[in-house]
Amino acid sequence: RLREQYRDQIEVRIGVELGLRPHLAEYYSRFVPKYPFDMVIGSVHSVHGVDPASEKLFEGKTDAQVYRMTFEESLEDIRHFHDFDVMGHLDYVVRYGKNKEKEYSYKMFADEIDALLRELIEHGKGLELNMAGLKYGLPFAHPHPDILKRYRELGGEIVTVGADGHRPEHIAW
């Protein structure tokens, strides 16, 4: 209805963000084709079944250990499901680390990140440049600029920009 109502003023598009998990791949394979989505973002919102925003994920681990686990699990998630357009906020787990970006750089996790990027590129997937990292006090958006550069070096071509706006005041943040 909105597309029709505002067709002379703006182009209304429909998208969805899916929390990728291997056990949901079959369900998503049936869900996505049922709707006329213009954009499907595939994101990782849990690591070993725990939300990265939860302190529980970091208990007894260094930030670097959690970041590595997240990249490894993200790779497994995208290997099980390919019916999305871009991967959302690839390194957003850094927002929640005890030391944030102090235990994080592309070079520290190059093997894991490169494997992820190659998998995305092989299947024609893009990356979302998610501005929320800045909103959460990081000196960069997600993913880190070095990851975007590496994505391009490996042949990646698709980058979208998002605000991670869960509330109206966060749109176009």
Enumerate the language-model features and the residues they cover.
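Extended substrate/RNA-proximal surfaces in nucleic-acid metabolism proteins
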Residues: 1-122
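Charged catalytic cores and adjacent phosphate/nucleic-acid-binding surfaces used
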Residues: 48, 100-173
